[in-house]
Amino acid sequence: MTRSGYIVKWLLLGILPLLTAVGLPAYSADGDTLSQVKSRGTLRRGVSEGVAGFSAKDASGRWSGIDADFCRALAAAALGNADMVTFVPLKGSARFPALRTGIVDLLSRNTTWTLVREGTLGVQFASVLFYDGQAFMVPKQRGANAVAALDGATVCVEKGTSSEIHLADYFAARHLSVKPLVMDSASEAANAFFAGHCSAYTGDASALAAARLRAPGGAQSYTILPEQISKEPLGPVVRDDDAHWLTLVRWVFFSLIAAEEDNVTRENVGERMRDPVVERAFDAGDDVSKAIGVEPGWAVRAVQSVGNYGQIFDRNLGPGSPLNLERGLNRLWTQGGLMYAPPMR
């Protein structure tokens, strides 16, 4: 199917009702995204419908999570105000057409970077915000301790995700049988699992941990199996027709990594920038700021708004959060992880 074929198919599947539901006008996605964002005065960002630690509304109705914080950092860099973000909840099957048709300026909603997506959907991934892997959650009373124990089981999975593909491929390659129960959204898949319609629920390990927090009977009643059957590099996504916007999104993320590498935090960024060594490593200069279309000090504004990558992780996913996840591959490269910022100069 051609790229236009994908878009038409998805439009017919529900993207036009989404326009009405969120009160946003349809318009051509062509052109300078940054100029459109500045003219509009807000960054429109596609989010999940609620994944704790990534993008979910808190008790006050404010969006929180690592994805939400990244978008605030981008808004601070591009617009000078971290609060100039409009969050648009999207189902997995609606996220790419929403991006391609200009409903949102970028996606940052638990989206896996794959060749098929970049090669056929007219999108580009700016970076990896979180290294994850697909896992399985089962009721503790089931006693399963390996994925192979799920042979013949019914497994809940969200429609239109890489998890749906990996589930079928993994079991087929091992001559095991599986009965997928495909649901339209992650919340529906989780609810079906907790209601007993499935023996297991599969998805990104971090999303399973988030879903377990709201499990009936408590999180302690469910186990996430240690095996991971895929690599799931999750990151922000933009359209492939605006290299200028891609550059800005990518380097705002790298600035958050660079800040952690140089021990620049939300609290000390002003003081640390007085060190010429840190300033050179963390600020590419006024000419570069002009070239990418933002006011000087954009990286400082990003860190001042949400902190460096380590602070964002700890607050939303790590020891400062209900999820309490290990950083694992998301540690800095100097600490055995994969997070690494190219030099700014």
Regions found by a protein language model. Name each.
Residues 2-12:
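Bacterial N-terminal signal peptides that target proteins for export
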Residues 10-21:
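Bacterial N-terminal signal peptides
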Residues 29-110, 292-294, 309, 332, ...:
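Extracytoplasmic small-molecule ligand-binding "clamshell" domains
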Residues 33, 70-71, 94-99, 186-192, ...:
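Short, hydrophobic alpha-helical packing/hinge segments within bilobed ligand-binding/sensory domains
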Residues 44-53, 63-78, 112, 132-188:
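Bilobed "Venus flytrap"/periplasmic-binding protein-like clamshell domains
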Residues 69-78, 140-144, 148, 153-154, ...:
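Extended ligand-binding regions for polar small-molecule ligands
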Residues 72, 76, 80, 84-149, ...:
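Acidic, polar ligand-binding/catalytic clefts
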Residues 285-345:
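C-terminal functional modules
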